[in-house]
A protein has these predicted regions:
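P-loop NTPase switch module centered on the Walker A-proximal segment
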Residues: 1-98, 102-104, 138, 142, ...
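Short hinge/gating elements
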Residues: 6-7, 128, 167-176, 256-264, ...
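Residue-level signature of catalytic and energy-coupling elements of molecular machines
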Residues: 14, 20, 52, 71-73, ...
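Active-site phosphate-binding and catalytic loops of NTP-dependent enzymes
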Residues: 30-57, 80, 146-158, 190-203, ...
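Conserved C-terminal guanine-recognition region of P-loop GTPase G domains, centered on the G4
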Residues: 88, 94-156
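G-domain G4 guanine-recognition motif of GTPases
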Residues: 99-100, 123-137, 162-176, 283, ...
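Conserved catalytic-core segments of large NTP-driven translation/proteostasis enzymes
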Residues: 148-282
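C-terminal effector modules of nucleic-acid-centric enzymes and ribosome-associated factors
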Residues: 261-263, 268-339
Length: 339
């Protein structure tokens, strides 16, 4: 059985989260030496690249020594509260990334509070210590106070701290002595973040996010909590209203590097993507057909944003845009509701 660590990264907008993940990916040698890549690999949605923010959570996976590390990128905004909560359900620990000058910000508090509530183990990374006027020691105190105010347990308050600069590709335990490697962070993840806790019993997996492909339709993503999921087998899909549907797993993928690898079976503790399951919603449980036991649903905060769609009355009306007819707009909006 391979050793797995599932970690989520929490950070305020612009504190360097996506850059840090980029450096981890490069350190684990996913790219060939001569391969071209864009910076901000994780922000692959157009809006995210334009604004430099993370809205949807993405999963990447790196292998370090003999451990598979699944990295789950979380949105840093309270506006995406539902997304945050679902994503943290897949993790066993979190990396809290904080700017060495700005310190913990209000939005960090929201996501960190959710993580501590779920009992996740934190590692604190104080980033950008190369900036002028940075104050790493004060920021460390501020993080401790924040966790204390959020009712962290004694174990959570004994968090491991690393200092560094993701941009300059280093992390270490002493910010006054920079080194030249980001690997101490991966060592800390393997050492301090617990392995997934695996319960005995029949298959259970909660769908915590989804992906969409024009070829195979909706893809269910989640972490296998108990048992295993096998390709080609039939399972029970437990819906919110108590209805249990029979579904068949057509294809099974695990995250490997920036992509996905097709596999025939996924064991408890790993995160996987399933195609072929029709009519699922986020929060549904894929369970054993003979003995379907649904997992508790995730309570999601109500959305904090209202939108109004009106007729375009700008001077460029009808002259630009990819989706211009009402049919196109309807299809595009409906596709968004499937996510």
């Amino acid at each position: 059985m391979q050793s797995i660590r599932n970690i989520a990264i929490i950070a305020h907008v612009d504190h360097g989260k996506t850059t840090l993940v980029d450096k981890i990916i490069h350190a684990s040698k996913i790219f060939r030496e001569n391969q071209q890549f864009e910076d901000l690999i994780l922000d692959n949605n157009d809006l995210e690249r334009e604004r430099g923010i993370t809205i949807l959570s993405k999963n990447v996976s790196v292998r370090y020594k003999d451990t598979k590390i699944n990295i789950i990128d979380t949105p840093g905004h309270a506006d995406f509260g539902g997304e945050v909560e679902r994503v943290l359900k897949m993790a066993d620990g979190v990396i809290l990334l904080v700017d060495a000058f700005e310190g913990p910000m209000p939005q960090t508090r929201f996501v960190l509070g959710k993580a501590l509530e779920l009992g996740l183990t934190p590692i604190v990374v104080i980033n950008k210590v190369d900036k002028e006027n940075c104050r790493p020691d004060e920021v460390h105190e501020a993080v401790f106070e924040l966790m204390f105010n959020l009712d962290a347990t004694e174990e959570q308050l004994e968090f491991h701290t690393l200092y560094g600069s993701a941009k300059n590709n280093w992390m270490g335990e002493d910010w006054k002595n920079p080194n030249d490697s980001i690997l101490p962070l991966l060592d800390a993840v393997v050492k301090y973040i617990p392995e997934p806790k695996i319960d005995e019993g029949s298959t259970q997996m909660q769908i915590t996010s989804l992906d969409f492909s024009n070829f195979v339709g909706r893809i269910a993503i989640g972490r296998v909590k108990r048992g295993s999921i096998k390709e080609g087998q039939q399972y029970a899909l437990c819906k919110e209203d108590g209805v249990v549907k029979r579904v068949k797993v057509k294809e099974l993928h695990v995250f490997e590097g920036l992509g996905k690898n097709k596999v025939t079976e996924v064991q408890a503790g790993d995160i996987c993507a399933i195609t072929g399951v029709e009519g699922f919603d986020i929060g549904d449980t894929i369970a054993d057909l003979e003995n379907p036991e649904p997992l508790d649903r995730i309570s999601i905060d109500e959305p904090t944003m209202n939108m109004l769609f009106t007729i375009n009355n700008s001077p460029f009306f009808g002259k630009e845009g990819k989706f211009v007819t009402s049919r196109h707009l309807r299809e595009r909006l409906m596709k968004e509701t499937e996510k």
